[in-house]
Every structure is written in structure tokens, then in C-alpha cells.
Regions:
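N-terminal secretory signal peptides that target proteins for export/translocation
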Residues: 1-4
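Short, hydrophobic/aromatic beta-strand segments
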Residues: 83-89, 103, 146-148
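Transition segment at domain starts
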Residues: 29-65
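Short beta-strand elements
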Residues: 147-163
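Sec/Tat signal peptide C-region and signal peptidase I cleavage site
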Residues: 23-27
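Bacterial N-terminal signal peptides
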Residues: 9-21
Length: 163
């Protein structure tokens, strides 16, 4: 590319940013008042596991007046393709040599076979991360199915816990 064309491209890119046509990425955190004194804060992401399966990943905190908050991670796989093993805890590989376990909330009964939900209250107290996490998903038919959680998603989750 010659210098004149390079300058034109650079000016166009600057103009696009200046006019606000491209906005910076923002956190996808939602807050909903479910009832008076009851707030739900959540982050929703669609992520792919190492096998190429798409997952709906919902991290949420429910806060009720005069009650301790509950913090959960819900994982939803494609119906008919994925089935969680219940009761089975979720292994969270924070870094080499550090694996935390999140208790299965649906140990008694899951709303659907492709849905898993895990208690993150104890995980929040031990939270350490400056990198991605890998979740070992307790599903049927797979030797080891892993879902990588990018660092920007973990930062959203930390923001939900802090508020």
C-alpha cells in the first residue's frame, strides 16, 4: 500500500471512531428488580466449548432484603445434544494446580437435561484470576468436556459479586 492510500485509510478509521460509529465493548451486565427488595444481577454470554458446542452461560446474583445473596452459574447446552449428570459438582480450573468445586444446585431435579446450575457462593470467597478459567462440564457421553471462560467474562462476574 502506498503512503497516500495508507494515510486515507488511517484518516477514515479515525473519522469512524470520532463519529462514534464504532463503540467500545461494554459489560453485558443486567440488573432487574424482580420484586420490591429483590434484585437480580446477571451476565449472559454464548461461548463454545473445545468440541465446538455452543453454551449459554449465565452468571447471576440474587439479592433479597435481609437475606444473604445467592450467586450461581447456569450452563445451558443444546437440547438433545447435551445432558448433565446430576448430582455432580462442577470443576473449575483457575490455574495449574488450583481447581475449585462448585456444588450442583440441581442435585435433586433439573428443569431440563441440558441445564446445569452451580453454587458460586463459596467460589466467590476464594476468587483468584488474572487469566481464563476452564470448566470441566459434568455431562454424559463425553470423557472430558471443557468450556473456557475468557478473562473479560470473569471480570464481569467479579463486578456482579462486588455490587
Amino acid at each position: 500500500m502506498n503512503p497516500k492510500n495508507r494515510l486515507i485509510v488511517l484518516l477514515l478509521v479515525d473519522l469512524v471512531f470520532f463519529l462514534g460509529l464504532i463503540t467500545p465493548a461494554t459489560a453485558a451486565i443486567r440488573q432487574i428488580e424482580e420484586a420490591p427488595g429483590q434484585i437480580l444481577s446477571q451476565s449472559r454470554q454464548t461461548l463454545e466449548d473445545k468440541a465446538g458446542n455452543a453454551w449459554q452461560v449465565v452468571f447471576f446474583k440474587q439479592t433479597k432484603t435481609k437475606q444473604p445473596s445467592t450467586i450461581n452459574l447456569r450452563l445451558v447446552g443444546f437440547p438433545g445434544a447435551i445432558a448433565f449428570i446430576h448430582p455432580k459438582d462442577l470443576a473449575i480450573n483457575i490455574r495449574p494446580g488450583m481447581t475449585l468445586m462448585a456444588a450442583d444446585v440441581f442435585a435433586e431435579k433439573s428443569p431440563a437435561p441440558n441445564v446445569g446450575q452451580y453454587d458460586f457462593n463459596k467460589i466467590a470467597a476464594q476468587w483468584q484470576s488474572n487469566s481464563f478459567w476452564e470448566l470441566e462440564l459434568p455431562v454424559t457421553g463425553e470423557e472430558k468436556l471443557e468450556l473456557r471462560i475468557p478473562y473479560f467474562v470473569i471480570q464481569e462476574w467479579q463486578s456482579i459479586i462486588a455490587n
